[in-house]
């Protein structure tokens, strides 16, 4: 009976550890996604005015890939994100694929509690966010 009790306790501890690690990864991913959302909005605000097609036309917001990436990195630096997240990187695909949408892709390493010795480099997570600027009167 003692062996059975010890076995159940070990299984319960194992389940609790796995749930705790999975919850930690999930929460860190949500934090990274929130950071990516803020960076994409900041990047979408870095537009320049496009050329007018005709005299009565309305100006358009034009984004460049380099400017989007620069604005995203600046946003992350101002918010201390590089200190909060381990191995935080801005992916090379960050930019503006169509000149109107800012796409920010962030990647970081998560170190879950208790099971950190099993994955010493951490678990890589990635968050993608898009934002658009629209001019209106």
Specify the residue positions occupied by each region the protein language model found:
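Low-complexity, S/T/G/P-rich flexible repeat/linker segments used as non-globular hinges
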Residues: 112-137
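Alpha-helical assembly-interface signal, strongest on the long, hydrophobic N-terminal helix that forms
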Residues: 1-68
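Generic short beta-strand segments
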Residues: 106-112
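Short secondary-structure boundary micro-motifs
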Residues: 1, 7-9, 15-16, 77-79, ...
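Short amphipathic secondary-structure patches
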Residues: 42-105
């Amino acid at each position: 009976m003692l062996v059975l009790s010890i076995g159940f306790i070990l299984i319960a501890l194992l389940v609790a550890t796995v749930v705790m690690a999975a919850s930690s990864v999930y929460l860190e991913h949500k934090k990274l996604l929130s950071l990516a959302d803020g960076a994409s909005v900041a990047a979408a605000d870095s537009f320049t005015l496009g050329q007018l097609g005709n005299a009565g036309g309305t100006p358009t917001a034009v984004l460049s890939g380099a400017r989007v990436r620069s604005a995203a990195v600046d946003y992350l630096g101002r918010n201390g994100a590089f200190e909060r997240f381990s191995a935080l990187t801005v992916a090379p695909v960050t930019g503006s694929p169509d000149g109107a949408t800012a796409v920010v892709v962030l990647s970081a390493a998560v170190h879950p509690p208790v099971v950190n010795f099993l994955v010493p480099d951490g678990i890589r997570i990635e968050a993608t966010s898009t934002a658009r600027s629209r001019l209106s009167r």
